[in-house]
């Protein structure tokens, strides 16, 4: 083995043995620096005859290239190892909020929490989420839903209307989320299985009513849908939402223009000491309305009622939030009181899931 080969082998061994970047830099200077061993060999080329310079120069440059590549590879390896060691030493994940912060921290509003709880429950049953605009047409909000002209819900004291257009038509703030069901039936063919959460508006304000409130409605359209399916869905929802093992429900005849038959649903509960406990007791509490979709509604939305049938239900998100979490006044939900929110709000990581617990 020639002296050049011995030198190259020794330098490569020193590179491999370098334990940090400082040691590696010392090897680089010793080999390729101004007074380095390979630099010294390159300086001797000027004293050689042309033929020898050609041969020796090629060999020295090959050795220099091998050393340079080894230095680069070792430097990258040492940098990666240093970064891994630094990351391993830094145990704080700055991307996550603290569960018990030292400073005051914001809270998730109970309405947002309940909205997520509803979504988690119905998503587990295979429902998609459908959304629509708050500003609606009279056609979608009333006419296609079998509200005849002169129905009380069309009166000014119930509905927020915009100024009439030149053609006499008027837009309005939707009074329920049922227009989303209309838009869904107009835009897609059965089978349909959706929930429609959102803001709704009616001209009313007291301890249990606000001009703007939140609803969630559900819609199922298929060839074999019947009331038995509806009762099962509502029972499973109530058990999951109120986090009880069993729930008794009472279905009472009622009237809604868009369903036939129409039903109101009560849930068994026990009242006492300022609390409501579900799944036990001898009291009953109304929680929602439901029924089979009226054939006139199906026809108005382009669905043949001789082939398909379906059911729908609706409930106030604000109301069921108050029932579950013991809030007395609906208006407090919208007053932006930080003290109230600190009491009833949720921590940022309290994400509802059926596996982990909705309100844990």
UniProtKB/Swiss-Prot annotation:
Top enzyme class of this protein? ligase
Coiled coil, from the record? none
Check the record and name the InterPro entries matching this protein.
aa-tRNA-synth_II, aa-tRNA-synth_II/BPL/LPL, Phe-tRNA-synth_IIc_asu, Phe-tRNA_ligase_II_N, Phe_tRNA_ligase_alpha1_bac, Phenylalanyl-tRNA_Synthase, tRNA-bd_arm
Extract one GO cellular component term from the record: cytoplasm
Q: Which domain of life is it from?
A: Bacteria
Q: Residues that bind Mg(2+), according to the entry?
A: 260
Alphabetized SUPFAM superfamilies for the sequence:
Class II aaRS and biotin synthetases, tRNA-binding arm
Write out the catalysed reaction.
tRNA(Phe) + L-phenylalanine + ATP = L-phenylalanyl-tRNA(Phe) + AMP + diphosphate + H(+)
Cofactor annotation comment: Binds 2 magnesium ions per tetramer.
Q: What cofactor(s) does the depicted protein rely on?
A: Mg(2+)
Tell me, what is one Gene Ontology molecular-function annotation carried by this entry? tRNA binding
Q: What is its EC number?
A: 6.1.1.20
Principal location:
cytoplasm
| Pfam assignment, any one | tRNA-synt_2d
Sorted alphabetically, the Gene Ontology BP terms of this entry are: phenylalanyl-tRNA aminoacylation
The record's subcellular locations are: Cytoplasm
UniProt keyword annotations, A-Z: Aminoacyl-tRNA synthetase, ATP-binding, Cytoplasm, Ligase, Magnesium, Metal-binding, Nucleotide-binding, Protein biosynthesis
Q: How does it assemble?
A: Tetramer of two alpha and two beta subunits.
| Family recorded in the similarity comment | Belongs to the class-II aminoacyl-tRNA synthetase family. Phe-tRNA synthetase alpha subunit type 1 subfamily.
List, alphabetically, the HAMAP family matched. Phe_tRNA_synth_alpha1
What is the protein name for this chain? Phenylalanine--tRNA ligase alpha subunit
Organism of this sequence: Rhodopseudomonas palustris (strain BisB5)
């Amino acid at each position: 083995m020639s002296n050049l080969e011995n030198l190259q082998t020794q330098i490569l061994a020193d590179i491999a043995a370098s334990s940090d970047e400082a040691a590696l830099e010392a090897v680089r200077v010793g080999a390729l620096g101004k007074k380095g061993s390979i630099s010294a060999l390159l300086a001797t080329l000027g004293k050689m005859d042309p033929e020898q310079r050609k041969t020796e120069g090629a060999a020295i440059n090959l050795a220099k290239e091998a050393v340079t590549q080894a230095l680069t590879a070792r430097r990258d390896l040492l940098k990666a190892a240093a970064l891994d060691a630094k990351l391993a030493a830094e145990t704080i994940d700055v991307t996550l909020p603290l569960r018990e912060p030292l400073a005051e921290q914001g809270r998730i509003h109970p309405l947002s929490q309940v909205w997520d709880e509803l979504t988690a429950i119905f998503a587990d049953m295979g429902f998609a989420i459908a959304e629509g605009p708050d500003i609606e047409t009279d056609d979608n909000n009333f006419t296609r839903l079998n509200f005849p002209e002169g129905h009380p819900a069309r009166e000014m004291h119930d509905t927020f209307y915009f100024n009439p257009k030149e053609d006499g038509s008027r837009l309005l703030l939707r009074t329920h989320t049922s227009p989303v069901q209309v838009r869904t039936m107009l835009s897609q063919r059965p089978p349909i299985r959706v929930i429609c959460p959102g803001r709704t508006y009616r001209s009313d304000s007291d301890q249990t009513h606000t001009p703007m409130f939140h609803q969630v409605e559900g819609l199922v359209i298929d060839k074999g849908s019947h009331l038995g399916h509806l009762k099962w869905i509502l029972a499973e929802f109530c058990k999951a939402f109120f986090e009880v093992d069993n729930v008794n429900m009472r279905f009472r005849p009622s009237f809604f223009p868009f369903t036939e038959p129409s039903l109101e649903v009560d849930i068994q509960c026990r009242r006492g000491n300022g609390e409501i406990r579900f799944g036990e007791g001898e009291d009953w509490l109304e929680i929602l309305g439901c029924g089979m979709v009226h054939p006139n509604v199906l026809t108005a939305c382009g669905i043949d009622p001789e082939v398909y049938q379906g059911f729908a239900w609706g409930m106030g998100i604000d109301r069921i939030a108050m029932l579950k979490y013991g809030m007395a006044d609906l208006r407090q939900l919208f007053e932006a009181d930080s003290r109230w929110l600190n009491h009833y709000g949720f921590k940022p990581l309290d994400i509802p899931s059926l596996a982990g617990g909705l309100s844990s």
